[in-house]
Structure formats: structure tokens, C-alpha cells
């Protein structure tokens, strides 16, 4: 089974290009095992990271993602007190 994750974020003014470049680098790292495919989508002032991965790698890959988020959090605006800097959505990919 494969999982699809969409992580929504909104860079602070002046950090958009740097954040997108950093995200491109992160999602292409070879140590991200279990990744089947990945994309970056932009719309208006938001950036969406879209990743398809093997379901059995979801937990370990999510931990890598949180470590990465901690390195770029200063570049992101908070959505609200609950979601904070990202709005994630993950579910089973139906083919």
C-alpha cells in the first residue's frame, strides 16, 4: 500500500525562494527511503510538498520530515495555534 501526504506551508515574506530551494533539496535526498514520488506545488503565497511513499515507511519518513521542519521553521508563518507552521494531510493512495 502507498500513502500520499500533502504538507501545506506559507513562507514568511522574504523567505519564499530560499524555502522552496531548501524543500526541493530535502525531498530529493537519497536517504529518504520508501519515497515513490514527490512534487512541490506552489499557489499564491503557499508551498505544498506532495509525497507518495510506501506505507511501511510512513513513520520513519515523518520523523525525518519533522527534523527538517525544525531547521526551516523560522522561515514559515504560523497558520494558527493548533496547526502552527504546516497543515498536513495524509491518507491511503487509491489507484
Locations of the language-model features?
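Short, low-order "capping/linker" segments at domain edges
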Residues: 85-95
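Short beta-strand segments enriched in hydrophobic/aromatic residues
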Residues: 11, 42, 53-54
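Short, surface-exposed ligand-recognition loops at beta-strand->loop->(often short) alpha-helix junctions
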Residues: 10-21
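Short hydrophobic/aromatic beta-strand element in the GNAT-like acyltransferase core
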Residues: 4, 37-38
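A generic structural motif
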Residues: 46-52
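Short glycine-/aliphatic-rich beta-strand segments at the starts of folded cytosolic domains
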Residues: 1-11
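A short beta-turn/loop motif at secondary-structure boundaries
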Residues: 39-45
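An amphipathic, aromatic/His-enriched active-site/gating alpha helix that lines ligand/cofactor pockets
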Residues: 25-37, 52-86
Amino acid at each position: 500500500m502507498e500513502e500520499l501526504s500533502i504538507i501545506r506551508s506559507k513562507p514568511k515574506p522574504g523567505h519564499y525562494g530560499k524555502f522552496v530551494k531548501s524543500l526541493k533539496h530535502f525531498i530529493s535526498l537519497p536517504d529518504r527511503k520508501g519515497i515513490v514520488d514527490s512534487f512541490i506545488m506552489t499557489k499564491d503565497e503557499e508551498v505544498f510538498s506532495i509525497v507518495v511513499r510506501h506505507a511501511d515507511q510512513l513513520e520513519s519518513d515523518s520523523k525525518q520530515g519533522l527534523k527538517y521542519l525544525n531547521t526551516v521553521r523560522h522561515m514559515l508563518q504560523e497558520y494558527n495555534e493548533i496547526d502552527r507552521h504546516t497543515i498536513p494531510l495524509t491518507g491511503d493512495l487509491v489507484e
